[in-house]
Amino acid sequence: MSSLPRFSQINPATIVAELDTILAQNRAELLLLLSEIISLDWNFIQKLDDLDDRLQHFWSPINHLHAVKQTAKLRLAYNECLAKISAYSSELSQNSRLYQAIKTLDNGDYRFNYAQKKCLHNELRDFHLGGIDLPKAKQKRYQVIQAQLAQ
């Protein structure tokens, strides 16, 4: 993996398909991660971060390119991807199994350092801001609103 983005290799024609692949991989790995929980520890959070890093490594250069050197094709791909990323984000923030796993870590007898505790508290805060406490019907409405805001 290169340390700098290769902007010249970003192809608007393939961005949506590449994002779909990454989101599918992340969803599959999250399901596997949640199904394999035997004992929770900090490795669980690190694996979640790896999923986020994969998405950010892909999306950040595209987001930057969209801001500084926009073309019609890039704009179309970017807008289509925004809706998908928004849906994925809402899906994660309303995933009750993921929320419970992180809550269990936070409430457990683990000895985390300050940064780790802060990370857990921020994760739980983000779940609440993402609508985890809402009834299912209101969660769906929240997802619709988030999708509209992403447009």
Regions found by a protein language model. Name each.
Residues M1-Q151:
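Zn2+-dependent metallopeptidase catalytic domains
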